[in-house]
Curated annotation (Swiss-Prot):
Organism for this UniProt entry: Mus musculus (Mouse)
Consequences of knocking out this gene: Males show normal fertility however females produce smaller litters. Increase in the number of 2-cell embryos with asymmetric blastomeres as a result of impaired central mitotic spindle position and therefore an increase in the distance between the cellular center and the chromosomes. Disorganization of the F-actin filament network around the mitotic spindle and loss of FMN2-expressing endoplasmic reticulum localization to the mitotic spindle periphery in zygotes and oocytes.
Composition bias type Basic and acidic residues, residue spans: 207-217
Function, in words: Acts as a positive regulator in the activation of the canonical Wnt/beta-catenin signaling pathway by stabilizing cytoplasmic beta-catenin. Involved in transcription activation of Wnt target gene expression. Plays a role in symmetric division of blastomeres in the early stages of embryogenesis via regulation of mitotic spindle central positioning and organization of the F-actin filament network. Plays a role in regulating the distribution of cellular organelles, via modulation of cytoskeletal dynamics and cytoplasmic lattice formation.
ZnF endpoints (BED-type): 33-95
UniProt keyword Zinc present: yes
Record note on quaternary structure: Associates with the subcortical maternal complex (SCMC) composed of at least NLRP5, KHDC3, OOEP, and TLE6 via interaction with NLRP5 and TLE6. Interacts (via PPPSP motif) with AXIN1; the interaction is direct, enhanced by protein kinase GSK3B and casein kinase CSNK1E activities and decreases GSK3B-induced beta-catenin serine and threonine phosphorylations.
Presence of the UniProt keyword Ribosomal protein in the record: no
Post-translational modification as stated in the protein's UniProt record: Dual phosphorylation on serine and tyrosine residues of the cytoplasmic PPPSP motif by GSK3 and CK1 may be required for AXIN1-binding.
Chain spans, region Disordered: 95-114, 183-228
Annotated protein name in UniProt: Zinc finger BED domain-containing protein 3
GO cellular component term of the entry, any: cytoplasm
Location in or out of the cell: Cytoplasm; Membrane; Secreted
Length: 228
């Protein structure tokens, strides 16, 4: 009489089945004849499609137990082989069928602390030196760019200051010209018959000279001639 009680496999068991480290460091062999022979002892539930492995069940042809609900084909095969080796090992030995998939020890992982030797060591050393030089050059370039930007900002500030100073000088010259014209009109009104020379046109200012000194002297000379 076949039993319909399914074989329960927890998530922890599935993780251990899928993790070689949990099995004593043994790596599973690739899918081959032994795996296909293990599947020969089971038949799938016809009510479920083959690709929906999480909801399908495989029924053992020897005892009727059901194994299933696993996410991938490899874990399914491991569970089937484990069931055969745990429950039907005598039958498998008699029929000379493999009781479990062929396993081989996993190669040890490369040690991260293993020292490099020979050409590889020299190559690593050269790469480290190049990386250090590149980092130093990048830092130096950043410093130079920052200094150049600071110099450009300072130059722009000086240009703005010179522009404002030139505008101020131009305004002063215009104001001085207006005052000269007003003074000439006042002198003509005070002495109608006197010959008052026209005020000269303003000369361009020389650097580092005070235009007020020359203007005051010319005004004093003009007033002196009129009084005489």
């Amino acid at each position: 009489m076949k039993s319909k009680k399914p074989l329960k496999i927890t998530m922890e068991d599935s993780r251990r089945l899928n993790d070689p480290a949990e099995q004593g460091g043994l790596c599973p062999a690739p899918v081959g004849p032994s795996y296909s022979e293990a599947w020969g002892y089971f038949h799938l539930d016809p009510a479920q499609p083959r690709h929906r492995m999480m909801s399908a069940w495989a029924t053992c042809r020897l005892c009727g137990l059901q194994v299933g609900g696993l996410p991938n084909f490899q874990m399914w095969t491991r569970a089937l082989c484990q069931h055969l080796s745990d429950v039907h090992l005598p039958e498998l030995k008699k029929s000379a069928a493999p009781s479990s998939p062929t396993t081989m020890p996993c190669p040890p992982p490369p040690s991260p602390t293993m020292a490099a030797e020979g050409d590889w060591a020299r190559l690593l050393e050269q790469m480290g030196e190049l990386a250090m030089r590149g980092s130093q050059r990048e830092l130096e370039l950043e410093r130079r760019e920052a200094a150049l930007m600071q110099a450009e900002l300072e130059l722009e500030r000086k240009r703005q200051a010179l522009k404002q100073e030139a505008q101020s000088v131009e305004q002063e010259r215009h104001q001085l010209q207006v005052e000269r014209e007003a003074l000439s009109k006042w002198i003509k009104k005070q002495s109608p018959g006197a010959q008052v020379p026209e005020p000269p046109s303003p000369l361009p200012l020389l650097p580092k000279e005070d235009p007020d000194i020359h203007d005051n002297n010319s005004d004093n000379d003009m007033v002196t001639k009129v009084l005489l």
